[in-house]
């Protein structure tokens, strides 16, 4: 559906090209095409060229995968999605043209298309609703210790051990959508929850016989 550092300048609107789309993998090269999909859907319209790439405005309610192949209406491949930019309610994306395709050969308003299997629903990048007040998260319970055998009969063993494990850590706040370009205002930075939870609860101490 990584994080790139410095921005690449040159957008007509002055947007930063460092569009950090939460959880994005590294920029992959062009892979061998297995052929166009049986059906292509309109993804967006060409706006202008920038540094050899095509800047497009999305007209699709869904979000394209990074590196998703992009086609003309006749299913001729022209390149792959390189960046997703803009606020969550107005998405832009860039296309890295494949060999033989020149970004400046397109005119503003030219339509580009994508396979339906290369789209993600917008809801996937929105924060999940908070649980209702008063609800408590389920806690994992550690197993009890066993009984040790052997040795002469004596008094009771050591008192029960304390609970193990560090206190539960909380992750960072959930993100919203996409970072990067400042087209029409700031977007939301995507991403999954931050740091994981703490270690599981330790078992109780055993009794010696």
UniProtKB/Swiss-Prot annotation:
The protein here is known as H/ACA ribonucleoprotein complex subunit gar1
Quick one: where is this thing mainly located? nucleus
Q: Where is the composition biased (Gly residues)?
A: 1-29, 142-209
Task: From the UniProt entry, list the residue stretches annotated as the region RGG-box 2.
Answer: 144-203
Summary of subunit composition and partner proteins: Component of the small nucleolar ribonucleoprotein particles containing H/ACA-type snoRNAs (H/ACA snoRNPs).
| Chain spans, region Disordered | 1-36, 125-209
Assigned keywords, A-Z: Nucleus, Repeat, Ribonucleoprotein, Ribosome biogenesis, RNA-binding, rRNA processing
Query: What Pfam families does the record tag this protein with?
Result: Gar1
- Give the span(s) annotated as RGG-box 1: 4-29
Q: Which GO terms describe its cellular component?
A: box H/ACA snoRNP complex
The entry assigns this protein to a family as follows: Belongs to the GAR1 family.
Task: Tell me the GO molecular function terms.
Answer: box H/ACA snoRNA binding
Q: What does this protein do?
A: Non-catalytic component of the H/ACA small nucleolar ribonucleoprotein (H/ACA snoRNP), which catalyzes pseudouridylation of rRNA and is required for ribosome biogenesis. This involves the isomerization of uridine such that the ribose is subsequently attached to C5, instead of the normal N1. Pseudouridine ('psi') residues may serve to stabilize the conformation of rRNAs. The H/ACA snoRNP complex also mediates pseudouridylation of other types of RNAs. The H/ACA snoRNP complex mediates pseudouridylation at position 93 in U2 snRNA.
The cellular location(s) given in this protein's UniProt record come to: Nucleus, Nucleolus
Highest taxon in the source lineage: Eukaryota
Q: Which PANTHER family match?
A: H_ACA RIBONUCLEOPROTEIN COMPLEX SUBUNIT 1, NUCLEOLAR PROTEIN FAMILY A MEMBER 1 SNORNP PROTEIN GAR1
- Does the keyword section mention Ribonucleoprotein? yes
Q: Name one GO biological process term.
A: snoRNA guided rRNA pseudouridine synthesis
Question: Which InterPro entries does this one have?
Answer: Gar1/Naf1_Cbf5-bd_sf (IPR038664), H/ACA_rnp_Gar1/Naf1 (IPR007504), Transl_B-barrel_sf (IPR009000)
